[in-house]
Amino acid sequence: MNETNDNDIDQLIYLFSKLPGLGIRSARRIALYLLQDKDVRLKSLINNLVEIDKKIVKCEICGNMDTENICRICSSEYRDKSIIAIVETVAELWAMERSGNFKGLYHVFGHNLSAASRQNPSILRLPELLTRCFAENIKEVIIATNSTLEGQTTAYFITEYLKEHPAKISRLASGIPIGGELDYLDDGTVSAAINLRQPFE
C-alpha cells in the first residue's frame, strides 16, 4: 500500500475519532469494517449521509432538526403550547422526548454561556424566545439547561432577560447532579426532573 493510501485511511480514522464517544481504537475498527466491504458498507453510508444532508433542516421556530421547516413538535396539535422548555442543544431536546414526560414546546439555543470565554449573549437567540413568549401566550418557561457552571450561568441570564414577561419560570429539579449533562442521564432521571421542576429564583 502506498503512502497516499495510508494517509487517506489515516484521515478516515481521524475523522471517525472526532465523533463523540469514539477514540482512535474504535475509529480504526469502524474504518476497517467499512473498508473491508466498501462497495456495500461504505457506499451505503456515503449515500445515506448525502441524503440526510439534503433533507435535514433546522426548524424555523424552535431550532430542532427535522425534514420540514416547521418541525413535527412545533406543528403538532397535541402539544401543550402554553409551556416551553429551553434546552442548550437538540441532544437535550431528544433526551426530554425520550422521557415521554414532556408535552410542551421547545426553544433550542444551540449554545450556553461561559464566563471564562466571555461569549456574547446574542448567541442564545433570546429576542426570538421573548417574541415567542408574547406571541404564543406562554404560561411557563422551563429552563432545561445542564447543571454545569455554564448551564447555571445561562439559566440566570435567561431569567433576567425574561423578567418583563409574566410567565412562570421554573428549572428542572432533583435527579440532575451538579455538573451533569441532560443527554447522558437515563430516561427515568430526566422524567423525574421534569415532574419535580421548581420555580427558578
Curated annotation (Swiss-Prot):
It comes from the Bacteria. Pfam families: RecR_C (PF21175), RecR_HhH (PF21176), RecR_ZnF (PF02132), Toprim_4 (PF13662). Residues 82-177 form the Toprim domain. Gene3D superfamilies: 3.40.1360.10, RecR Domain 1 (1.10.8.420). The keyword Acetylation does not apply. One of its GO terms (biological process) is DNA recombination. Disulfide bonds: none annotated. May play a role in DNA repair. It seems to be involved in an RecBC-independent recombinational process of DNA repair. It may act with RecF and RecO. This is Recombination protein RecR. It comes from Rickettsia peacockii (strain Rustic).
